């Protein structure tokens, strides 16, 4: 089955932009439509169509999806929750869309470390995966999804590194352009990825990519030395679980919402760096990685770091705020 007409939901975000950039390399092979809310300030490249939609309206969504072969969901915010996401999917089915590319783009969502995160914070990714699996089994619409590790993380303006735990926990870092390349190849060749998720781990050897090796590679690339502070990630983990229980007691409004925010900052860190349980995402990833399936070549850590520095600049501050968590905050 060949896909020609591709609708990108959330085309102006990091992932949407990376996918569009990759698809545009094929010239006229793909007809791309970027779909946004009417309030969006998105300015599309000259070669793609821009269409606005009401994400709360089934008829508006269905009309936008008419004649589209694939819908690639890259939206963020409230529309990632279960009911809004299901509405988008149902509209795609009604419009005759062949492939739905799910809005995952995280780590392995079947891991318990991810599934325990409150849906109010991370969206309905797990339940949406199950819903799409059902549609695939019934032959109503094919689906796929793409996941990797964090796109990039180091705070370089002041040459300071925060190391969580020992710093030796394997990281499954996926450069953003690699996500774009993989998604593009998935749309170029549907059959191998129909009705299945794809997990990337493109840096080799993956078992040696850690905070410490990343730091040493950065220091070598920049010909400098970082100051280092160590963070007790086990304390963050313990406190985050306590706060999560408080959130469950308080609900999603008022104090409960504040408690959830604290817990999520801690659990987000622990999902990457905590070493104190049996959830071992390194082993999980080794079993499910599908780099070759989607045309992703293995790259050396040194090359990945150099490419990231060229792309973001030597003084970038990339997602640092996500990981800047102290146990006392919880």
Language model features by range: what are they?
Residues 101-102, 145:
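Hydrophobic residues in well-ordered beta-strands that form the structural core
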Residues 34, 39-95, 102, 108-114:
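NAD(P)H-binding glycine-rich loop region in Rossmannoid oxidoreductase-like domains
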Residues 62, 176-184, 298-309:
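Short, amphipathic alpha-helical "lid/cap" segments that border enzyme active or binding sites
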Residues 2-31, 35-45, 56-58, 95, ...:
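Oxidoreductase cofactor-interface core, primarily capturing Rossmann-like NAD(P)-dependent enzymes
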Residues 215-279:
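Terminal hydrophobic/aromatic helix or amphipathic segment near a protein terminus
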